[in-house]
Amino acid sequence: MLDKARLRIAMQKSGRLSDDSRALLARCGIKINLNQQRLIAYAENMPIDILRVRDDDIPGLVMDGVVDLGIIGENVLEEELLKRRAQGENPSYITLRRLDFGACRLSLAAPVDFDYQGVECLNNTRIATSYPNLLKRYLDQKGITFKSCLLNGSVEVAPRAGLADSICDLVSTGATLEANGLKEVEVIYRSKACLIQRDGEMDATKQALIDRLMTRIQGVIQARESKYIMLHAPSDCLEDVIALLPGAERPTILPLAGDQNRVAMHMVSSETLFWETMEKLKALGASSILVLPIEKMME
């Protein structure tokens, strides 16, 4: 039984976003015993309940106010939104932020021997998909008439099984398409995981907890996207060194014992540091260059 005084968060029980969602909560310091058999898990150190459900149930649970927050792929969220609007409903929710995992794309794919010259080639054909509403919106915008073959899994086998001429499915690497004799021909939607909140009045205590959680999530994502950089550099090259690190805050400059011509620099950079950048730093006279991951970060 759920305690309505506790913050309720829905997340995928198993699948593409499950592990990353659990890792995000753990890095936010939320201690949860996620036993594989339990559909409801309780945080040990915060008044939070986790509902572990199918991913396509999460948007509805948030829109209907059953849970307070949901971690869901934008593709699933948008599909549910379009479905409800087509049924005459006016669903609402609040997107709190995009997350830094779950990147994928919803694409049209056709058999490798199909002579694809553009989306017009799909006019009056049969397309298998688990996302009929996203597919319809895209092809309606292109003026394409098609027949939809709704499948809830194994969409990629539809052309080989004679169920459809082509498919519209999620693609991450394209390996599954290739294994089934298909080629990606058109990207119709790009998606990442996102955190959403139910619309409507929220208890002040719950809202304060959501604000705390958002601060932690922001810190976790910022830490993953940032690096702590330490190096020694000539005093007369400081601005050139800083210019190679766009996104970095102004560095901390420390004197080096016994060397008046060089200093130690410490800084946080939000940019990916490639080997080429490190080589350029070295060419400017920098040495002892260390690039370290950041576990937690708060501005």
Curated annotation (Swiss-Prot):
Enzyme Commission number(s) from the entry: 2.4.2.17
NCBIfam families recorded: hisG, HisG_C-term
Key word Hydrolase present: no
Principal cellular location given in the protein's record: cytoplasm
Record text on activity regulation: Feedback inhibited by histidine.
Domain of life from the UniProt record: Bacteria
Reaction catalysed by this enzyme: 1-(5-phospho-beta-D-ribosyl)-ATP + diphosphate = 5-phospho-alpha-D-ribose 1-diphosphate + ATP
GO annotation, cellular component aspect: cytoplasm
Source species of the chain: Proteus mirabilis (strain HI4320)
Pfam families in alphabetical order: HisG (PF01634), HisG_C (PF08029)
GO BP of this protein: L-histidine biosynthetic process
Function: Catalyzes the condensation of ATP and 5-phosphoribose 1-diphosphate to form N'-(5'-phosphoribosyl)-ATP (PR-ATP). Has a crucial role in the pathway because the rate of histidine biosynthesis seems to be controlled primarily by regulation of HisG enzymatic activity.
Protein family (similarity comment): Belongs to the ATP phosphoribosyltransferase family. Long subfamily.
Protein name per Swiss-Prot or TrEMBL: ATP phosphoribosyltransferase
Cited PROSITE patterns: ATP_P_PHORIBOSYLTR
GO molecular function, one term: ATP binding
The UniProt record lists the keyword Nucleotidyltransferase: no
Subcellular location(s) per record: Cytoplasm
Database matches in HAMAP family: HisG_Long
InterPro entries linked: ATP-PRT_HisG_long, ATP_PRibTrfase_cat, ATP_PRibTrfase_CS, ATP_PRibTrfase_HisG, HisG_C, N-reg_PII-like_a/b, N-reg_PII/ATP_PRibTrfase_C
